[in-house]
Amino acid sequence: LATDLITNGTTRVCMFSSLHTDATLVLMDELERAGVTGYVGKVNMDRNGLPGKLQETTEESVQETLRWLDACHFEHIKPILTPRFTPSCTNELMTQLGKLANERGLYVQSHLSESTNEIAWVKELHPECSQYWETYDKYGLWKDHTLMAHCVWSDERERAAIRDAGVVVVHCGDSNVNICSGICPVRRMVN
């Protein structure tokens, strides 16, 4: 992967790895040795996954994230906290990740408003939040340099919250077309 990135002219990345700590460290090492710079995140998810395979317990997720952070000694590839998205993280996990982000000065990346079904699901899980973005804000994960993937269905209020907080929208048109989730209103965001 790292060599392919360089061969194709990609020299900077911001990537989701997996919830597996050792695999994430291997990816980071490969990227570092290939000369790629950027951020890689060990994915956190303690609900709505596949228990034992693609889902950790809250305690495992926090402990493995700490182990991963303590092992990150790369010069050009930096760690970024990566709660997969609100539906895959319990309140306790989001609280712990928010503390880590603030204590260690770490950037955060996740998903936001990828589809209307996802937004409805988040409302079911967090009826106390009137908007999806608030589920990150309440845990200290909505801040300057937070990266949010997709943002296809972000309304004017959410776009204002993105702008006001200094959150960065990361959008890949091919990805959203592939999963038929919609087209990000990039022009509205730029204006």
What are the roles of these predicted feature ranges?
Residues 1-23, 87-93:
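Divalent metal-binding segments
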Residues 1-3, 65-71, 158:
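Short, charged beta->alpha transition segments
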Residues 2, 28, 94, 98, ...:
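Short amphipathic alpha-helical segments and helix-helix/interface helices
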Residues 10, 105, 166-167:
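A structural motif
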Residues 12-16, 80-83, 147-149, 170-172:
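Short catalytic-loop micro-motif centered on adjacent basic/acidic residues
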Residues 22-152:
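Metal-coordinating catalytic core of metallo-dependent amide/deamination hydrolases
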Residues 141-191:
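Active-site-adjacent C-terminal substructures of enzyme catalytic domains
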